[in-house]
Amino acid sequence: MSDENLLTSLDTYLASGIHIGTQQKTEDMKRFIYRVRSDGLYVLDVRKTDERLRLAAKFLSNYEPQDIMAVTRRVYSVGPLKKFGETTGINTVAGRFVPGTLTNPAAKKFAEPEVMFLSDPRVDKQALKEAIEIGIPIVSMCDTEHLTAHLDFIIPTNNKGRKSVSLMYFLIAREYLKNRGIIGEEVPFSYDDFLEKAMGAKVKMPQQNQRGRPQRRFQRR
C-alpha cells in the first residue's frame, strides 16, 4: 500500500497503532478486518480506516460546529477530544455523560445537537441511547469487537490507544476544517498537539488492601 491518496503517511498510521484491534471480532466489524495475527489479535485494514475517516469528516462538515456533539468517556481520549473541540468549535462532552442531557429540557446542560460523534459505542452507551431516542445521526469509532446496531456511520480503528485516538481526532479535525473552507493546506495545529493531551492522561491505580494486594472493583458493562 502506497502513501498516495492517504490522509497521512502509512508509516504514521502504523506507528499510531490504529490498525491494532482486539482478540475479539463481531460480524458487524468483519468487513473492516484485514487479517488475524499469530497472537490472536485482529488487524484492521488501514485503507478502509482512511476511507471511512475521510467520509466521516465530509459528513460532519455538513453541520455547523455548534450542531455537533462529540463524546468520550475513555481516559486516553479525553485530552485529544478537548483539543478537537478547541480546534473545530464542536461541542464536546469529555467524561461522564449526564443522563437527560439530550432528553430532559430541564437538565442543567440540556443540548439539542443534530449529530452525535462517539469514541466508543459501548463505553459511551448513555450518549448513544439518548441519540437514538431523539433520532439524530450517530457517527462512531469502532474496534473489532463492537456491535454497530443503531450507528449510522462507522470509523474502524483502535479506539483505545493514546496514539491512535490522538491521530483520529487530529485527522478528523483537520479534514472537517478543510471541507468547510476554514483552513487550507497550512494547518495551524499538529498530531503532536493532540498526542500531548493524551500523554497527560493519568489512570487511577487500584487501591491496596491491608495485605498489599489490589482490591478488585467490578463494574457493569
Curated annotation (Swiss-Prot):
One of its GO terms (cellular component) is small ribosomal subunit. Gene3D superfamilies: Glucose-6-phosphate isomerase like protein, domain 1. Residues 202-221 are annotated as: Disordered. Signal peptide: none annotated. One of its GO terms (biological process) is translation. PROSITE patterns: RIBOSOMAL_S2_2 (PS00963). One of its GO terms (molecular function) is structural constituent of ribosome. Keywords: Ribonucleoprotein, Ribosomal protein. CDD domains: RPS2. This is Small ribosomal subunit protein uS2.
